[in-house]
A protein has these predicted regions:
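Substrate-binding pocket helix/loop in short-chain dehydrogenase/reductase
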Residues: 81-82, 89-94, 194
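Residue(s) in the substrate-gating loop at a strand-loop-helix junction
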Residues: 125
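Short, small/polar-rich loop/turn modules that mediate ligand/substrate recognition or access, typified
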Residues: 158, 163, 224-226
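Short, flexible catalytic-loop segment of classical short-chain dehydrogenase/reductase
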Residues: 169-179, 218
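Alpha-helical segment proximal to the catalytic Tyr-Lys
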Residues: 110, 155-156, 222
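Active-site helix of classical SDR
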Residues: 105, 142, 150
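C-terminal substrate-recognition "lid" of short-chain dehydrogenase/reductases
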Residues: 102, 202-231, 236
């Protein structure tokens, strides 16, 4: 089960899971993106899903009661400091970036527990409790909460066959990144600034993060839980 599978890291991870032989349930709020994904990868089960809707998540959990893997990839990057963040901005970011994961984990965990196993992978960010980043006030706050949520689930269910880990990427190529760059004026200068964050002097690729997600979801990482896995081109050295 993959959220935000329509583009970027979510799409790359859904494809990577499928390439490993998984039966992938790919979800996204964008039906057009799902249609494209389904056409290119007809073995996937594609479902439109608004992760801000408890009712939609509950309905999906009745169709897929016990997934082996849950990859929570949905997220939104709000630009600005605390002075740029209204209560509405705060509530939206936390609802989408954190509460959506609470909803999906709470919906799918019972089936995992009945099965006696399950791997949950949550998308956090290097801009979180790992380190700060300028103009990422509510984004960093919400992604820090994802780290806390991940560790809490990991410790509560570690003896019941459930693993829960978080991925903390640096700046990764994606349509959402392109949108943020375009919104800030001098496109080439802004792009150079994003690239300069990483000592490797390049942006990450969705497929690189997808490979880490596959590892954390698989039995190859069976002795790993409650961890924040940084993949950031050296940003946090």
């Amino acid at each position: 089960m993959v959220t935000a599978a329509g583009q970027g890291i979510g799409r790359a991870t859904a494809i990577a899971f499928a390439n490993e032989g998984a039966i992938v349930w790919a979800t996204d709020i964008n039906q057009e993106a799902l249609n494209t994904l389904s056409q290119e990868h007809p073995t996937m089960v594609c479902r439109k899903l608004d992760v801000r809707s408890p009712e939609e998540i509950t309905r999906l959990a009745t169709e897929l009661p016990a997934p082996d893997i849950l990859f929570n990839c949905v997220g939104f990057v709000h630009h600005g400091t605390i002075l740029d963040c209204s209560e509405k901005d705060w509530d939206f970011s936390f609802d989408l970036n954190v509460r959506s994961m609470y909803r999906t984990c709470r919906a799918f965990l019972p089936g995992m527990l009945r099965a006696g196993h399950g791997s949950i992978v949550n998308m956090s960010s290097i801009a979180s409790s790992v380190r700060s980043a300028p103009n990422r006030f509510v984004y960093g706050s919400s992604k820090a909460a994802v780290v806390g949520l991940t560790k809490a689930i990991a410790i509560d269910f570690v003896k019941q066959g459930i693993r829960c880990n978080a991925i903390c990427p640096g700046t990764v190529e994606s349509p959402s990144l392109e949108g943020r760059i375009a919104a800030q004026g001098d496109v080439e200068q802004v792009r150079r600034e994003f690239v300069a964050r990483q000592p490797m002097a390049r942006l990450g690729r969705p497929a690189e993060v997808a490979a880490l997600a596959v590892y954390l979801a698989s039995d190859e990482s069976s002795f790993t839980t409650g961890q924040t896995h940084v993949i950031d081109g050296g940003w946090n050295i």
